[in-house]
A protein has these predicted regions:
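Short coil turns that delineate tetratricopeptide repeat
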Residues: 37-39, 84, 131, 165, ...
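Alpha-solenoid helical repeat scaffolds
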Residues: 30, 70-73, 77, 124, ...
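Terminal, low-structured helical/coil segments at or just beyond the last alpha-helical repeat
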Residues: 178, 183-226
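Extended amphipathic alpha-helical interaction segments
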Residues: 88-192
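Start-of-domain marker
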Residues: 6-70
Length: 226
């Protein structure tokens, strides 16, 4: 009997990441993504995302790697498509928390600057990372409204509503839950300001069970519902 080939564990990439040898990590990981035997393995793409993400905040890399953050997102999306369950990247939970925060922060900046096409793309990275991120779909829907993409907005809001109404939305992570709360509050207040109170109340009711003890949510709920 022949032993079945096991998928590589890419411990060499982990070692380079831990040792902060990021350029070497990128070179090695890219080699795996171009190799016929390993190009469909998810971890090399994740390590490329992690490497670029670290480099994006280190001054000495800014000149040679000016697009490090964008490249981090690009490879994060590639990883997510290959690892639907995120099982292979489970031990790197801190990275996912950090990059999600960075994406949300960058999207907020883009929204403030009315660069909605860019913020829309950033929210897409969040939904690529977690297809049950109802908050990301709500915010994505709002950006579609801002750029007058009515059909796409309807699709995003419909997805968010389905996730909330079927209890499939991701709320186990506290930061993701807070993002959902903020998205619901922002969208509900936007609807209410447009004299669409019934829709605002509907959205708040969809998320209410997740925020029964959250003062901020309850204050906004009371101010809109009355």
């Amino acid at each position: 009997m022949f032993a079945s080939a096991q998928a590589p564990d890419f411990r060499d990439l982990l070692s380079m990441f831990v040792d902060e040898k990021y350029p070497k990590l990128l070179q090695k990981a890219e080699g795996y993504t171009l190799n016929e035997k390993t190009k469909k393995e998810a971890l090399p793409y994740l390590f490329m995302s992690m490497g670029y993400y670290k480099m994006s905040s280190i001054d000495k890399y800014k000149e040679d790697y000016p697009d490090a953050f964008n490249n981090s997102l690009k490879y994060l999306s590639k990883y997510a498509k290959l690892d639907k369950t995120k099982e292979s990247g489970a031990e790197y939970g801190d990275f996912f928390i950090d990059i999600r925060k960075s994406i949300i922060s960058e999207a907020e900046i883009m929204n403030d600057q009315q660069k909605y096409t860019k913020s829309k793309a950033l929210y897409k990275y969040l939904t690529d990372l977690d297809a049950n991120d109802a908050g990301a779909f709500i915010m994505q829907g709002m950006t579609f409204v801002a750029i007058k993409s009515k059909k796409e907005a309807e699709t995003a809001f419909k997805t968010a509503k389905e996730l909330l109404s079927t209890d499939k939305c991701s709320v186990s992570d506290k930061d993701q839950k807070a993002f959902l709360k903020n998205a619901l509050i922002e969208y509900a207040n936007s609807l209410n300001s447009q004299s669409r109170k019934s829709e605002a109340v509907e959205w708040l009711n969809l998320g209410k069970k997740h925020f029964e003890d959250d003062k901020e949510f309850q204050v906004n709920y009371s101010s809109i519902v009355g």
